[in-house]
Amino acid sequence: MRNWFFSTSLILFLSCTSDLQPKPWGYLRLDYPEAQYQNFEKLASFSFEYNNFAKVSIANQYNSQLVYPKMKATLYLNYNAVNNNLDSLLNDAYKLPYKHISKAESIPEKVFVNPVNGVYGTLFSVVGNAASQYQFFLTDSLKHFLVGSV
């Protein structure tokens, strides 16, 4: 019995060797058709172009959503009129991404300036395990203020 156990253990031990082979690199493949844009002008406050793969949902004249079902993403847009309250709107826009600071590893900012059209803004990339990975605001500093998040 002792020899049988020893020989069985030896056979199992020697038969469990395998040659290690390197695994090929895997890449994420996202196939989306070429983007085709259409104008969105249903709100009196602002207009923009969006991809026709998105579905637009209008909650009211100030809030709307762009839903991309194939990408499982939603872009939330919130419009505010500027009425001598640009400071408070900017403070709120800067506070919003930093609500995720407990889950975020970092929140780099990217400033957007288009002096020809008078549009200014900031894009916040929330790196880490946060509910909203990208947040931004755009304004002309006079009449319009748009906040968005993905």
Where are these regions (language model features)?
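Short, Gly/Ser/Thr-enriched beta-strand-loop segments that form substrate-interacting elements
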Residues: 119-135
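Sec-dependent bacterial lipoprotein signal peptides
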Residues: 1-17
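N-terminal targeting sequences that direct proteins away from the cytosol to non-cytosolic compartments
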Residues: 16-73, 81-90, 99, 105-116, ...
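Short, hydrophobic/aromatic-rich beta-strand segments within well-structured domains
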Residues: 136-138, 147-148
